[in-house]
């Protein structure tokens, strides 16, 4: 005998919900149409859902994650990169007489020769070391913190706090393998990260769902399917709304 597989019907939104979704999408669409002056004026930028591998003039490598922006300034005395937005992984060529600096928000990283990741978004900066040593200066300490293999530092401008942790190699810049590793993160925070990889908009309509916690490895090459798989056990659903719009809500 054939087995019938039930599939949940798409959720029907009320007229009020549709009005809210439409207004939010329209506002976001207007914002998206505005010129991205930060990206236009920067030395390097990467488009949505693409990485960009850059060989710098000293032979060092900078890999930009999706929707990331960076400025580069080298002179005879020092090498300096400013990560304005997003995430980057650096493989730095050692030059003992010319230090390599990465600026991200209020954090400054000093390097001689090493491999490490930096991210900056909404006032939060994270630094993770895959090999070698870096010195990280934050506003919370008079002296730089020395980070070695596996060390992870995060600084939040919101509460002016610096936190240290140990990370395994697979947790350092997993976006290089098109993975997002979420460990006890809120649905809202995961959606914020997925927006970097999803063309268009992701709208969260349920505040309670946004506060639920996720631990999962998500495939960044298919953000919609990855998000659906992650929130389905929590009673969430992802639906197509207006063109280039995903609507995240509690399941019917």
Predicted regions and their residues:
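A residue-level detector for the "anchor" residue at the start of short, highly conserved motifs
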Residues: 4-23, 29-252
